[in-house]
C-alpha cells in the first residue's frame, strides 16, 4: 500500500563504516516479499554501495539506483536534495505502486540530516567500534533522527566500549525518541527495525 503522494521514504544516515549499507541490505531482504521496494544509495564519487546491494541480491538490480553526490554528500540529502528527489521520482515511475524507498546517504559526520522534503522517516546508524562517547557527542543525527541504531555491539569488548554508558547517554540525548542496539552481521535487531518502519509508515497489518 503506497502513500497517496508516493512511496514512504526512509532516510538512512551515519558515519562511514557504521553499517548503513548493511542495514539497507538487511531491510530490503526482510521486507521485499511483503512490500514493493526500491533503494537509492549516495556515494561521493562512485556507486560502490549500489553495487554492493546488487551483488548481495538485496533487490533486483533495476530496483537499486546509485547517485554520485560529489564532494559534499550532506548537501544531496539536505540543502539541495534535487538529485535524490529525481531518483525517487524515477523509481516511482519505473515501479508504479511503490510502497517503500530506502535512501542511504553518503558517509558523513554527526551533523548530517535529511531534508523533510526527501525523507518521511530517518534512521541514523552509529557503531560501537567508534567508542562509547559517540551518543553524548550529540549532533542532529543522534538527537533528531526518528530511530537511532547502535550497531556492531559484538565489538564492545574488543574496543572496551560500555553498552551501559551508550544506553544511558542515548536516553539522555534523545529523550523519548527510540534507539536500538544491533549486530547486523547476525541480523540482531533487524526485526525490530522492520516493525518500527511498518508501524511508522502505516503499513502494519496490511
Curated annotation (Swiss-Prot):
Per the record, the GO terms for biological process are:
urea catabolic process
Give the CC-aspect GO terms. Answer: cytoplasm
Q: Which residues bind GTP?
A: 14-21
List, alphabetically, the Gene3D superfamilies matched.
P-loop containing nucleotide triphosphate hydrolases
Q: What is its main location?
A: cytoplasm
What InterPro entries does the record tag this protein with?
Answer: CobW/HypB/UreG_nucleotide-bd (IPR003495), P-loop_NTPase (IPR027417), UreG (IPR004400)
Assigned keywords, A-Z: Chaperone, Cytoplasm, GTP-binding, Nickel insertion, Nucleotide-binding
Looking up Pfam families in the UniProt record yields: cobW (PF02492)
Q: Where in the cell is it found?
A: Cytoplasm
Q: Which GO terms describe its molecular function?
A: GTP binding; GTPase activity; nickel cation binding
Per its UniProt entry, which superkingdom is the organism in? Bacteria
This chain's function reads: Facilitates the functional incorporation of the urease nickel metallocenter. This process requires GTP hydrolysis, probably effectuated by UreG.
Family listed: Belongs to the SIMIBI class G3E GTPase family. UreG subfamily.
How is the subunit organization of this protein annotated in UniProt? Answer: Homodimer. UreD, UreF and UreG form a complex that acts as a GTP-hydrolysis-dependent molecular chaperone, activating the urease apoprotein by helping to assemble the nickel containing metallocenter of UreC. The UreE protein probably delivers the nickel.
Its recorded name reads: Urease accessory protein UreG
UniProt source species: Methylocella silvestris (strain DSM 15510 / CIP 108128 / LMG 27833 / NCIMB 13906 / BL2)
Task: List the top taxonomic levels of the source.
Answer: Bacteria, Pseudomonadati, Pseudomonadota, Alphaproteobacteria, Hyphomicrobiales
Amino acid at each position: 500500500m503506497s502513500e497517496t503522494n508516493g512511496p514512504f521514504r526512509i532516510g538512512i544516515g551515519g558515519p562511514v563504516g557504521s553499517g548503513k549499507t548493511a542495514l539497507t541490505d538487511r531491510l530490503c531482504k526482510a521486507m521485499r516479499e511483503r512490500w514493493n521496494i526500491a533503494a537509492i544509495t549516495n556515494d561521493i564519487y562512485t556507486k560502490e554501495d549500489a553495487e554492493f546491494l546488487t551483488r548481495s541480491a538485496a533487490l533486483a538490480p533495476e530496483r537499486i539506483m546509485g547517485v554520485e553526490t560529489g564532494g559534499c554528500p550532506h548537501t544531496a540529502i539536505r540543502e539541495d536534495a534535487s538529485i535524490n528527489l529525481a531518483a525517487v521520482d524515477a523509481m516511482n515511475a519505473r515501479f508504479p505502486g511503490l510502497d517503500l524507498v530506502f535512501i542511504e546517504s553518503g558517509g558523513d559526520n554527526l551533523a548530517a540530516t535529511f531534508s523533510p522534503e526527501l525523507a518521511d522517516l530517518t534512521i541514523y546508524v552509529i557503531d560501537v567500534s567508534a567508542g562509547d562517547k559517540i551518543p553524548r557527542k550529540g549532533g542532529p543525527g543522534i538527537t533528531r533522527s526518528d530511530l537511532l541504531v547502535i550497531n556492531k555491539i559484538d565489538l564492545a569488548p574488543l574496543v572496551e566500549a560500555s553498552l551501559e554508558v551508550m544506553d544511558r547517554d542515548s536516553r539522555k540525548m534523545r529523550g523519548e525518541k527510540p534507539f536500538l542496539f544491533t549486530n547486523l552481521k547476525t541480523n540482531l535487531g533487524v526485526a525490530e527495525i522492520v516493525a518500527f518502519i511498518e508501524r511508522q509508515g502505516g503499513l502494519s497489518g496490511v
